[in-house]
Regions:
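Short, surface-exposed amphipathic charged segments that create phosphate/polyanion-binding patches used
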Residues: 1-2, 193
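Divalent metal-binding pocket/active-site signature
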Residues: 2-95, 107-108, 115-116, 120, ...
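Short hydrophobic/aromatic-enriched beta-strand-loop microsegments
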Residues: 75-78, 98-103, 187
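Conserved beta/loop motifs at nucleotide-recognition and modification sites
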Residues: 130
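Mid-to-C-terminal alpha-helical segments outside catalytic/metal-binding sites
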Residues: 147-193
Length: 193
């Protein structure tokens, strides 16, 4: 953890991670993953930087660790590339965390995920590409790229009943608030048609 904290002092480091639990691939033990996850949470708490959280097929254990660690002291975190269930998203929101969605939310069979996105407060949501993976419709199966994030934004804006421009403005504000080490003079909400 000391090395993570030391490296985080570099001016270009704006977050800790990605760290978390991945039970889809069984490359390391659950115990080892939990230990590493907790160390990253401690580093995020110590530095004040947001933690990018990876949670795949591990909602229950992720929620438990987040709740236990948050009880020890708050920290900023983003549930990156969110595809989990409603319970983990609700618990993250209750701890003032951000839930970030990718192109998966645009897929035909992702109605439950769109429902989760609709339930996340507007001031606690982000969109991302996770490029080169998870391209949104109509580019599913192709290499993802930053320009495609607008399709994810459009899908979530639609389920929230707001314009894409309103959604872009909100997510830009959320990004600036959470990633406060990023020079903000260059950030303007933009929707490219």
């Amino acid at each position: 953890m000391d090395e993570i904290v030391t490296l985080s002092n570099h001016p270009k480091v704006v977050a800790i991670g990605e760290a978390g639990l991945d039970y889809y691939y069984q490359h390391s033990s659950k115990e080892g993953q939990a230990e590493g996850f907790r160390r990253h949470i401690q580093a995020a708490r110590q530095t004040g930087l947001p933690l990018e959280i990876h949670a795949r097929d591990a909602d229950e254990d992720t929620a438990q660790i987040l709740e236990e660690e948050y009880a020890r002291g708050p920290f900023k975190a983003i549930l990156h590339c969110y595809t989990g269930g409603p319970e983990l998203a609700q618990k993250a929101v209750a701890m003032n965390m951000i839930v970030s969605f990718t192109g998966v939310v645009t897929f035909k069979k992702s109605e439950a995920l769109r429902d989760i996105a609709a339930s996340v407060p507007l001031d606690q949501i982000l969109v991302e590409t996770d490029a080169p993976y998870l391209a949104p419709m109509p580019f599913r199966g192709k290499t993802n790229e930053p320009a495609y994030v607008r399709y994810t934004a459009e899908a979530i804006a639609a389920v929230k009943g707001i314009t894409t421009e309103e959604f872009a403005a909100a997510t830009t504000q959320n990004f600036m608030r959470y990633f406060d080490k990023v020079p903000q003079s260059d950030l303007e909400p933009t929707v490219v048609a």
